[in-house]
């Protein structure tokens, strides 16, 4: 990854599975710290609330609040016995993609959709899949791309 200007990131984490959220957040913070980025963290109840929180942050910036160079979405959706998994997985991904495209956001999507706890932990831990770190590095890469393309707002 190329050297980018100092950046400020908003991490939005869903706390539906607290222990897994902690593991994902650890990976994201480690990646951002290694890159010299600063960040704020907000928590929401579940994955479906993450896009709304990002939209609120954008509205807040328009009104003089904190401005963010990029966003990291962290959450875990584990398949259960109902159709709810499909709704949460599909709609959270769709809403994040809509925001990223319509607002030209540098966004790392770390909302994991898995079949069971074993898959979740294998992806959440920094010592294994490190998907929290991956999402943070994706956001940093997209920030660098925005800067290189002159798409900064």
Curated annotation (Swiss-Prot):
Its EC number is 2.5.1.78. Pfam families: DMRL_synthase. GO terms for biological process: riboflavin biosynthetic process. The keyword Transferase applies. Keywords: Riboflavin biosynthesis, Transferase. InterPro entries: LS, LS/RS, LS/RS_sf. The active site is at 84 (proton donor). Pathway: Cofactor biosynthesis; riboflavin biosynthesis; riboflavin from 2-hydroxy-3-oxobutyl phosphate and 5-amino-6-(D-ribitylamino)uracil: step 1/2. (2S)-2-hydroxy-3-oxobutyl phosphate binds at residues 81-82, 123. It catalyses: (2S)-2-hydroxy-3-oxobutyl phosphate + 5-amino-6-(D-ribitylamino)uracil = 6,7-dimethyl-8-(1-D-ribityl)lumazine + phosphate + 2 H2O + H(+). GO terms for molecular function: 6,7-dimethyl-8-ribityllumazine synthase activity. The keyword Mitochondrion does not apply. 5-amino-6-(D-ribitylamino)uracil binds at residues 16, 47-49, 76-78, 109. One of its GO terms (cellular component) is cytosol. Belongs to the DMRL synthase family. NCBIfam families: lumazine-synth. Catalyzes the formation of 6,7-dimethyl-8-ribityllumazine by condensation of 5-amino-6-(D-ribitylamino)uracil with 3,4-dihydroxy-2-butanone 4-phosphate. This is the penultimate step in the biosynthesis of riboflavin. This is 6,7-dimethyl-8-ribityllumazine synthase 1. It comes from Rhizobium meliloti (strain 1021).
